[in-house]
């Protein structure tokens, strides 16, 4: 099926849509608003003090901007960078050894589509020196790509199947009980 990757009206190409949960201390990036909402739905019980960001594609500039902003917020210092400087924030962080010796290793998670483009984007950022946690939706047998919306739909289908399975098991138990009673009555009439 097709995927819509557009820049939403009233959203800045470098900012994307974002949602803060608690007092953000880390960043999770998705490729699209629907993936952001699906990722949230799948992980809402474990998300604390995080900013979820939709990049509207695969954009290092969006990562740089939000990295710059969150570091300023955490430090309590005003951020006086231009939008262009913020867009280069990831490269500035790499150049200033922000990730050296495992520092800030938990700050950035890329929850991208599990496809060639998503995996390549992660590898390219890591090759530059960024420390990235990747959280990709699991591929099902025969799939070569999937996204967080697919993962949410798959989970909902599995839950639905499980409830039908549970209903079938209860019905089977009830029918076995009725069968046992009928057999007992039949034998009691023969005796």
PLM segments and residue spans:
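Short gly/pro-enriched beta-turn/loop segments at secondary-structure junctions
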Residues: 21-23, 32, 47, 103
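Basic, glycine-enriched DNA-binding surface that flanks or lies within the catalytic cores of DNA
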Residues: 1-21, 45
């Amino acid at each position: 099926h097709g995927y819509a990757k557009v820049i939403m009206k009233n959203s800045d190409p470098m900012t994307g849509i974002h949602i803060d949960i608690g007092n953000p201390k880390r960043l999770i990036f998705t490729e699209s608003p629907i993936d952001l909402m699906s990722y949230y739905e799948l992980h809402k019980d474990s998300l604390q003090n995080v900013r979820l960001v939709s990049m509207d594609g695969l954009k290092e500039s969006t990562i740089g901007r939000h990295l710059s902003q969150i570091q300023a917020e955490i430090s309590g210092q005003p951020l006086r960078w231009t939008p262009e400087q913020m867009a280069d924030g990831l490269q500035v962080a790499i150049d200033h050894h922000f990730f050296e010796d495992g520092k800030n290793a938990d700050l950035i998670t890329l929850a991208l589509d599990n496809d060639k483009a998503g995996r390549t984007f992660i590898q390219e950022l890591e090759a530059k020196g960024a420390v990235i946690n990747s959280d990709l939706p699991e591929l099902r047998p025969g799939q070569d790509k999937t996204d967080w919306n697919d993962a949410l739909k798959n989970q909902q289908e599995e839950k639905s199947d499980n409830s039908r399975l549970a209903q079938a098991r209860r019905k089977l138990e009830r029918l076995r009980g009725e069968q046992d009673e009928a057999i007992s009555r039949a034998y009691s009439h023969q005796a």
